[in-house]
Design a protein with these regions (language model features):
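Non-heme di-metal
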Residues: 1-254
Length: 254
């Protein structure tokens, strides 16, 4: 597989990383008393241990240049020492804390079956395969979004909405001060995306590119099933084409 084909196939995977329920999460249609389920599953599935996932990719990587980039990523995720000022998993908990949720719930989260499968995949991808698969899954798939093409092609991007317009602030009353993680992500996003794509496109051996793409497609399938399960648990129903988004009959917009 040549480099351009590799690039386009990876971008095709990422452009499918769009979930039908996300517009409901970002428009206040999820009941406030069920929103904790989303946060708990995200935290337990990958947020809490994301520094560990990055660390596994670092340990497996034989290329000093990429290790240095992963080490910087790991240091920021684990300590917040470069930008955020606090470990990113702890800053994530500021969302539920600011919404008045019981943080003890996050100490013993029972993962949904689909979440367990996705987490098992993340563990396998970062422990049992090559550095290339570990780095691609962690730094491109997990950290990345459906808009990777804009970041990769350095297109002029629309500036993000003010923090005051963040859905958790606008619809659920989260204090803006609790968005420290969102603010940090905005500060480091550009450099992280560039480093991640440089590592994969310029250092993965041609004979390994097919395996990386196949694993990324597997990540997409498992992630989609995981988000389906979270949406269902939060009372959301996949909308029929042309219909209004559906939530359960008890739903109320916060």
């Amino acid at each position: 597989m040549d480099r351009e084909t590799f690039r386009e196939q990876l971008l095709a995977v990422m452009e499918k990383k769009v979930h039908w329920a996300w517009p409901m999460f970002t428009s206040g249609l999820v009941r406030k008393d069920r929103l904790h389920l989303h946060f708990e599953q995200e935290y337990e599935t990958y947020v809490r241990d994301f520094p560990i996932l990055v660390g596994r990719a670092y340990v497996r990587c034989p290329i000093p240049e990429i290790r240095r980039s992963l080490a910087e990523n790991l240091y920021e995720e684990e300590t917040g020492g470069l930008v955020a000022g606090s470990p990113h998993p702890l800053l994530f908990l500021e969302y539920p804390r600011g919404l008045g949720m019981d943080l003890k719930r996050f100490e013993q989260v029972e993962l949904l079956p689909a979440a367990k499968r996705y987490r098992r995949f993340l563990d396998d991808a970062t422990q049992h395969f090559g550095w290339d698969i570990a780095a691609a899954v962690v730094t491109i798939f997990v950290e990345g979004s459906s808009d990777e093409r804009s970041a990769l092609e350095l297109k002029e991007q629309k500036p993000p909405a003010p923090l005051e317009e963040h859905p958790l602030v606008k619809y659920y009353g989260l204090p803006v001060a609790r968005l420290a993680l969102t603010k940090a992500h905005r500060q480091v996003e550009g450099s992280h995306r560039a480093a991640a794509w440089d590592a994969i496109l310029n250092h993965v051996l041609p004979m390994r590119r097919g395996a990386v793409v196949r694993t990324m497609n597997e990540a997409l399938d498992l992630w989609s099933a995981y988000r389906d399960a979270v949406a269902e648990t939060c009372g959301l129903t996949r909308p029929i084409a042309g219909a209004e988004p559906a939530v359960d009959s008890l739903a109320e917009v916060a």
